[in-house]
Amino acid sequence: MAACVGSRTLSKDDVNYRLHFRMINEQQVEDITLEFFYRPHTITLLSFTILSLMAFAFTRDDSVPEENIWRGILSVIFFFLIISVLAFPNGPFTRPHPAIWRMVFGLSVLYFLFLVFVLFLNFEQVKAVMYWLDPNLRYATREADIMEYAVNCHVITWERILSHFDIFAFGHFWGWAMKALLIRSYGLCWTISITWELTELFFMHLLPNFAECWWDQVILDILLCNGGGIWLGMVVCRFLEMRTYHWASFKDIHTTTGKIKRAVLQFTPASWTYVRWFDPKSSFQRVAGIYLFMIIWQLTELNTFFLKHIFVFQASHPLSWGRILFIGIITAPTVRQYYAYLTDTQCKRVGTQCWVFGVIAFLEAIVCIKFGQDLFSKTQILYVVFWLLCVAFTTFLCLYGMVWYAEYYGHREKTLSESEDSPYSPDASWLHSKFSKGADNSPPKHPVNSESHSSRRRNRHSRSKVTNGIGKK
């Protein structure tokens, strides 16, 4: 049955396409019980915005020019985030609240616009902005200028090995635990981990801090820090996959402890998707898509090191770890949208957050190349070509291994792959009314005891249950 939009008739495929794209780009919240937190407050926000601007304009002291610029920039960011809450899409997630993910998308748009602005500056102007943000950056030095790398690699002692377990090793471990939670695939995680170590070898002629002893690179990085983080992240993934999700109203919880537990669990996923990046029936487009995923991931990691080397700031500076934290946050919806684009045949376009993330990755690379021409003039083109071929080889090797595993052990794995936080079921009547002229755009209501695709995740191997946010054995 076709649906109508104005005078144009939509086919069933068009309806399915719009529905699938909306599920990853504009996720809706199901079973809302606290209406106040999900009801639009546009008039309230408008009044707050006008009163705030009046207060800032007529009451604050504007005698200090630098303070005027700084507070003006912060106000622009603040009110841009308000517009983000009102106008931007939720993305694929709804926990802890869609407004948070709208602001995350708004921050990514602001960062994208900032990178565009930086492209039109010269190096002295960029450094002036950095010195204005932090005057101490005038005295910053490159780590490569004061430290030695890959020295006396034949000397292996327990004291030397233990000295490498610093804050950066801790960051490696937890960073890979978070990456495993995002990617949810042993094969891809290990491939990215090994490929990154190879990337360091190919770009070692540009960044001296990429030089490492073999035991540091293989044992400490790949096996212990990265491998331990991947294992921990995948254990958490398996635990979340095995749980049964049944979220109910705060009103149905009558104890104070239960309400507190339910409030805390609002910051956990509403459901969990079992991920299959590749299967034996995948097309060449899927293979190419995963290769592109690998390239962009490696590029984002490279940007971290090139930015701090070219613009001279330490890894411990807020400009470094703040960017890493920000990229990590926007990676979550990006990976979810990209995975849906690769695996869902009904999804014909990438989500907006995924699009902005891709632009940010390439813009950062362009900024590095523009302001680091002295550095990149030393680039060995042959190394870059070998790097691209190496990434391609490791990607196809990984996919071949995943296909082999799926063929021989796939029958033991779960094959169900649901859309995370998806409040939709294939209700034909609502699909028709959704795109009909003058129709109510709200999804169909389910009875309290019905089995919803997003509020319940059944698995016959499940050992634990979550009801109203309170675990029961």
Curated annotation (Swiss-Prot):
The chain crosses the membrane at residues 36-56, 73-93, 103-123, 187-207, 217-237, 287-307, 320-342, 356-376, 381-401. GO terms for biological process: phosphatidylserine biosynthetic process. It catalyses: a 1,2-diacyl-sn-glycero-3-phosphoethanolamine + L-serine = a 1,2-diacyl-sn-glycero-3-phospho-L-serine + ethanolamine; a 1,2-diacyl-sn-glycero-3-phosphocholine + L-serine = a 1,2-diacyl-sn-glycero-3-phospho-L-serine + choline. Residues 420-473 are annotated as: Disordered. Residues 1-35, 94-102, 208-216, 308-319, 377-380 are cytoplasmic. It is found in: Endoplasmic reticulum membrane. GO terms for molecular function: L-serine-phosphatidylcholine phosphatidyltransferase activity; L-serine-phosphatidylethanolamine phosphatidyltransferase activity. It comes from the Eukaryota. It is a multi-pass membrane protein. Its EC number is 2.7.8.29. Keywords: Endoplasmic reticulum, Lipid biosynthesis, Lipid metabolism, Membrane, Phospholipid biosynthesis, Phospholipid metabolism, Transferase, Transmembrane, Transmembrane helix. It holds the Pfam family PSS. The keyword Amino-acid biosynthesis does not apply. Pathway: Phospholipid metabolism; phosphatidylserine biosynthesis. Residues 455-464 have a biased composition (Basic residues). GO terms for cellular component: endoplasmic reticulum membrane. Residues 57-72, 124-186, 238-286, 343-355, 402-473 are lumenal. PANTHER family: PHOSPHATIDYLINOSITOL SYNTHASE, PHOSPHATIDYLSERINE SYNTHASE 1. Belongs to the phosphatidyl serine synthase family. Catalyzes a base-exchange reaction in which the polar head group of phosphatidylethanolamine (PE) or phosphatidylcholine (PC) is replaced by L-serine. Catalyzes mainly the conversion of phosphatidylcholine but also converts, in vitro and to a lesser extent, phosphatidylethanolamine. This is Phosphatidylserine synthase 1. It comes from Gallus gallus. The lineage of its organism: Eukaryota, Metazoa, Chordata, Craniata, Vertebrata. The gene is PTDSS1.
